């Protein structure tokens, strides 16, 4: 689905891709990041993003911001697991600096929006508007 869209000139935005697989299964899940990245590379035929934005926040703060009371299977895992997932995303970004950017997500929604917009503008040569709040 992704590759044909890219090949036809469509811009694809994903909220989960290789970094999530590496962080959840490889780093926090114990399979090892090198094994998971090898399998992901095989499955995606080496496809990598132009830009990966890692919105970094302490999991405890993230859970306080979560809307609704229902937790899914992953959200019910212990805090240690979520800390490992966070470290997994940061590790992935560190290993892929050419296309990765870590953004502090501990500010207000407007502040995080502006950080994301500024990085996207710089890295992708765009001219998106910031909220400026």
Report each predicted region and the residues it spans.
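NTP-dependent small-molecule kinase module
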Residues: 60-133
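Phosphate-binding/switch loop-helix module in NTP-utilizing enzymes
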Residues: 1-12
């Amino acid at each position: 689905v992704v590759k044909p869209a890219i090949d036809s000139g469509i811009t694809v935005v994903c909220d989960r891709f290789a970094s999530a697989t590496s962080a959840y299964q490889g780093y926090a899940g114990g399979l090892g990041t090198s094994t998971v990245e090898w399998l992901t590379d095989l499955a995606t035929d080496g496809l990598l993003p132009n830009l990966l934005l890692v919105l970094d926040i302490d999991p405890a703060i993230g859970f306080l911001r979560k809307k609704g009371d229902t937790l899914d299977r992953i959200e019910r895992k212990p805090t240690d697991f979520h800390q490992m997932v966070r470290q997994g995303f940061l590790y992935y970004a560190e290993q892929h600096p050419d296309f990765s950017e870590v953004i502090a997500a501990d500010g207000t929604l407007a502040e995080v929006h502006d950080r994301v917009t500024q990085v996207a503008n710089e890295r992708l040569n765009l001219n998106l508007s910031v909220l400026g709040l």
